[in-house]
A protein has these predicted regions:
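Bacterial Sec-dependent N-terminal signal peptides
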Residues: 1-24, 40
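Interaction-mediating elements
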Residues: 22-146
Length: 146
């Protein structure tokens, strides 16, 4: 009986997860939070938006903005940026915390920032030499990945 219960529970949770997994929908940029729109107009004014997508998971909602040049931005529900991926250009300098810029200038002089993301615990940047640097909340380097 116990075995049957766990098998049933596993099947139900798998089907629920699968049903909730694809809750992405294209939305107009006007439906983005106001601070997200301000961020885009400040740092990416010259780029044309290809599409905006609202991504809903079981416990969170994110927004993804994709520009025609391939640049991708991801924002949290509250409109704060989560990830910036500028694979064909570079992340605007004003977005990168000064301590991270200083570290990269000192150790990787001519490299550009292609990507940056952050969460509660750390910042991760990807440089044009393909190195990925991880910094803690106090901007101390904690990992280098090639």
């Amino acid at each position: 009986m116990k075995k049957l219960f766990f098998i049933t529970l596993a099947i139900l949770s798998l089907s629920f997860t699968t049903a909730k997994a694809d809750n992405d929908r294209v939305i107009s940029k006007e439906k983005l939070p106001a601070n997200t729109l301000q961020f885009i107009s400040t740092h990416f004014a010259g780029l044309k938006i290809s599409y905006v997508k609202e991504e809903r998971d079981l416990f969170e909602k994110n927004y993804q903005v994709v520009f025609t040049d391939g640049t991708k931005l991801e924002f949290q529900r509250n409109g704060e940026w989560k990830e910036i991926d500028c694979r064909y250009s570079q992340v605007p300098a004003a977005i990168i915390p000064e301590a991270i810029k200083k570290y990269v200038r000192e150790h990787y002089t001519n490299e550009k920032f292609l990507q940056i993301d952050h969460d509660r615990n750390d910042y991760e940047v990807k440089l044009s030499n393909r190195l990925e640097l991880t910094f803690d909340k106090k901007f101390n380097i904690i990992d280098i990945d090639d």
